[in-house]
């Protein structure tokens, strides 16, 4: 088990949810915080603590996006027309690494980011190696031929149709995906309750 895998499972226990819905997640059998006092249920969380935890869960879920990137995404969502929470999630879901993960090209958000940063993903026919690139409606994602037969990729692609959201499409025969539209919050398949309103309240203070 790699350090990233151990670390992400520990994050699930620390934040009190199975962040990625993984059956191997230690939170499923030890649903309390790690450490000596992890099973102490008498510890009360302040209002600020609840807001902070909601933010930390989302940051971890999207592959530990940096605080600067997260705050800048919120600032952009605030400037856009419409509901800030919906805008915020729409921006996070339009990131290239997130879309690669959602299309089941990679088994985890961390693996998706690695594929992008190593130049294994094409965006509209050109190499794209920046994970935070935001996609637009109609953008096309391709997997480079050099990695198409890697077992990990093949195993992930085999899940097509099971969990691919409706705002994306993926053609298994050509290994090509399409970003169809910006999703609504209700479209996003979070494995836990994403309390986006608490994140918005925290950043709006």
Swiss-Prot record:
Molecular-function GO terms, alphabetical: rRNA binding; structural constituent of ribosome
Keyword entries, A-Z: Ribonucleoprotein, Ribosomal protein, RNA-binding, rRNA-binding
Limits of the S4 RNA-binding domain: 94-157
Any one cellular-component term (Gene Ontology): small ribosomal subunit
Coiled-coil region list: none
Any Pfam family matching the protein: S4
CDD domains with a match to the protein in the record: S4
GO terms, biological process: ribosomal small subunit biogenesis; translation
Claim: Cell membrane is one of the keywords in the record: no
Recorded superkingdom: Bacteria
InterPro entries xrefs: Ribosomal_uS4, Ribosomal_uS4_bac-type, Ribosomal_uS4_CS, Ribosomal_uS4_N, S4_RNA-bd, S4_RNA-bd_sf
Similarity comment: family membership: Belongs to the universal ribosomal protein uS4 family.
Function per UniProt: One of the primary rRNA binding proteins, it binds directly to 16S rRNA where it nucleates assembly of the body of the 30S subunit. With S5 and S12 plays an important role in translational accuracy.
Subunit structure comment from the entry: Part of the 30S ribosomal subunit. Contacts protein S5. The interaction surface between S4 and S5 is involved in control of translational fidelity.
Protein name: Small ribosomal subunit protein uS4
Gene: rpsD
């Amino acid at each position: 088990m790699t350090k990233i895998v151990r670390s992400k499972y520990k994050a699930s226990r620390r934040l009190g949810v199975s962040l990625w819905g993984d059956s191997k997640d230690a939170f499923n059998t030890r649903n309390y915080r790690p450490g000596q006092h992890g099973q102490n249920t008498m510890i009360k969380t302040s209002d600020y603590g609840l807001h902070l935890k909601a933010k930390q869960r989302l940051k971890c879920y999207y592959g530990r996006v940096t605080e600067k990137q997260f705050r800048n995404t919120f600032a952009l969502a605030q400037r856009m027309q419409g509901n800030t929470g919906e805008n915020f999630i729409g921006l996070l879901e339009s990131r290239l690494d997130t879309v690669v993960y959602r299309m089941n090209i990679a088994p985890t958000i961390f693996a998706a980011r690695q594929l992008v940063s190593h130049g294994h993903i094409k965006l509209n026919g050109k190499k794209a190696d920046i994970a935070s690139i935001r996609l637009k409606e109609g953008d096309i994602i391709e997997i480079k031929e050099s990695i198409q037969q890697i077992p990990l990729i093949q195993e992930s692609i085999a899940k097509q149709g099971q969990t691919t959201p409706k705002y994306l499409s993926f053609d298994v025969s050509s290994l090509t995906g399409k970003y169809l539209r910006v999703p609504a919050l209700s479209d996003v398949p979070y494995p836990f309750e994403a309390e986006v309103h608490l994140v918005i309240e925290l950043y709006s203070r």
